[in-house]
Amino acid sequence: MADATSPFNVSILDNSTKLSEMVESGWNVLASTSVQAFNEAMDVLEESYPLCKKMLDHNNLFPERDPNDTRIWCNATYDTVLCWPPTPANSSVTLQCPHMKGLDPNKNITKDCHVSGVWSGRNAGEMGPTLPGWTNFTMCYTDEVIYIMQNLNNESLTIAQEVARNARKLEFVGLGLSLVSLILAISIFSYFRRLRVFRNLLHLHLMIAMLMVVILRLVLYIDLIFTGENGPHTNSAEGKTINTMPIVCEGMFFFLEYFKTVTFCWMFLEGIYLNNQIVFGFFNSEPKLLPYFIAGYGIPLVHTMLWLLVVLIKKDFKVERCLGSYYLEPEFWILDGPRMAELVINLFFICNVIRVLYSKVRESNNTSEAGLKKSVKAAMMLLPLLGVPNIMQTIPFAPTRDNIMVFAVWTYTASFTYMYQGLMVASIYCFTNKEVNHVLKTFYARYRLLHKSQNELRRGSRSVASHYAAKNGTANASAPQTNNADEFGKLSPFPSRSKKGSDDSTTKLMKDAVMEEEKNANNNGYGSAGEMTPLREGSNRSTKSP
């Protein structure tokens, strides 16, 4: 376990997004000090030096030394990250750390100019008039990178990096499946009026919040990939990706935390509603949605804005890039504390619902295994809804050289249970819901019937048109009219003695389908308040049985 100051003392929920970035950035920063990275950096120095001079001019630093100064100087140089101004020999120059993954821009970094007038290197081979010397970026390391250096050796760091990459792939698949399933479920609940009962509207808003979290995470993940492809030395002022856009990046993370809080809040409202319906029977009629709507979206907004205000006040309203490592700050408990409380209360709701359902089965003297399984199954449907997978996400777990394999299993399990939560919720409350399946089957049957009926009507219309065309053509002909009836009898598919009216078999089928639909529909268009969920149906059946 991590101590209170450990950068890994953060929920795996955020590790699923941040762990790979932290480990990969730490790995890249550590690797940037290698000889291979040094040799690769030399290839771009020649073309980067003009840019370095422009940067020095922009910062009011002299790119060239004073020709009247007879002292020995180190020339201005560019180490592919920072541009260093001319510096007198046997002295040093200090600059602010760059905005890069794994580096803290609030720290400073110092570069030494050797007494011989060349930039100091780690050894004599890295010193020369045309060489940039060695920049010791360990001065800029963030707490995460320092933690990695102190607690992970090369082998465990490699494993942690592999775990982070595999977890990212697992999350991509889970987020993609959740995205598709949530869009389908939301579309179904929104399209069919019979499904717009109160309990389904709660499910609908819960899935909307989950969908927004999924979309924001996918956008940030994809942006992180593009940021990495642009290279770690991309000029942050260019704003090519979200990660390099100051206001946009902070806004994305703010809305991510907001919709995460909205998800927790709608989970909590679902728990309150179901607990009151099953345990207390508060609502003889369905409650109004407006108070739930205000609470589900308004309270999280106030909650998230309060957290952001506290963070800004602490930092004197100087916002860090992408809000920095906000998930490591103690102020993050302003968000995580109430979320944890909602999860604990919802777990109590689950246990209480199971207890009530079990007692109702016993009181009804129906102790059959099938009845008990049905009640427990209905209660277990609440598990993904009320956020049990999130409990695993909120338990801090730190990787060290001693528990790296346990950490790998923990990370994979936590990533799977959270990132696939949207898929599980959509499956349980939509795709496997008998009521939804019945509505979809009815819709498909009516669609097939309508399609078949239209084809039959079109075929009938063509036959009637052929009949009249044949009749008119015969009447206008100059040939004798004695065989008109015989010719008509050969051309017409219908008996000449009778015609079917509008109430033929096809029309009757259409009327039956429409009457059946009108019979099942509610007058106000929002479904019946007394419709039974599997949960309520099992509860009421147990109560009414002798």
UniProtKB/Swiss-Prot annotation:
BP-aspect Gene Ontology terms: adenylate cyclase-activating G protein-coupled receptor signaling pathway; adenylate cyclase-modulating G protein-coupled receptor signaling pathway; cell surface receptor signaling pathway; intracellular calcium ion homeostasis; locomotion; locomotion involved in locomotory behavior; locomotory exploration behavior; male mating behavior
Transmembrane portions of the chain: 172-192, 206-226, 252-272, 293-313, 334-354, 378-398, 404-424
Cytoplasmic compartment residues: 1-171, 227-251, 314-333, 399-403
Region annotated Disordered, chain positions: 472-546
Keyword Flavoprotein: no
Disruption phenotype: Disrupted locomotion (unc); decreased speed, increased number of reversals and loss of mate searching behavior. RNAi-mediated knockdown causes reduced expression of TGFbeta-like daf-7 in ASJ chemosensory neurons.
A GO molecular-function descriptor: calcitonin family receptor activity
PANTHER family: PDF RECEPTOR, PDF RECEPTOR-LIKE PROTEIN-RELATED
The name this protein goes by in its record: Calcitonin receptor-like protein 1
Organism: Caenorhabditis elegans
